[in-house]
Amino acid sequence: MKHKIKKRKLSRCTEHRLSMLKNLSISLINHEQIITTLPKAKELRPYVEKFITIAKNKNTLHGRRLLLSRLHNNKLVVDKLLNVLASRYQGCKGGYSRVMKFSTRKGDCASMAVIELVNRDVTAKGKVCDKNKEKNEVATKS
């Protein structure tokens, strides 16, 4: 019986599933729109919305440390959450992301979906928050 089972297993062990969700959420926060399979997108949506809610309501040292511990210590993503996304969604009480069905994948006919942040910055799609990029810019200036 499947009583009180809310999460999908996605054919992975717990550690792999949590790591995959963390990586997908980092990509979604960076690019504000990603294409993935439909079950992964449906599982990712509440996961990311909790991060945005923490960034909105707990814009303190404790909130920053919570986000850092849950996002692989990626400081650039946490800074974007606290500075950009928290201020963007300050008036909203939820529903920060949307999942739209896409086509099927050619290789295995898996149903694909686009998950994106509502009121997203269209120019953020190609940009990557990367530490190496900042180091290269500093090196070329000097």
From Swiss-Prot:
Kindly give the InterPro entries that the UniProt entry links to this protein: Ribosomal_bL17 (IPR000456), Ribosomal_bL17_sf (IPR036373)
Citing just one GO molecular function, the answer is:
structural constituent of ribosome
An annotated GO cellular component of this protein is:
cytosolic large ribosomal subunit
Q: Which UniProt keywords apply?
A: Ribonucleoprotein, Ribosomal protein
Q: Does this UniProt record's set of keywords contain Repressor? A: no
Q: Which NCBIfam families match?
A: L17
Q: How does it assemble?
A: Part of the 50S ribosomal subunit. Contacts protein L32.
UniProt name for this protein: Large ribosomal subunit protein bL17
| Native organism taxonomy | Bacteria, Pseudomonadati, Pseudomonadota, Alphaproteobacteria, Rickettsiales
Query: Per UniProt, what is the name of the gene that codes for the protein in this document?
Result: rplQ
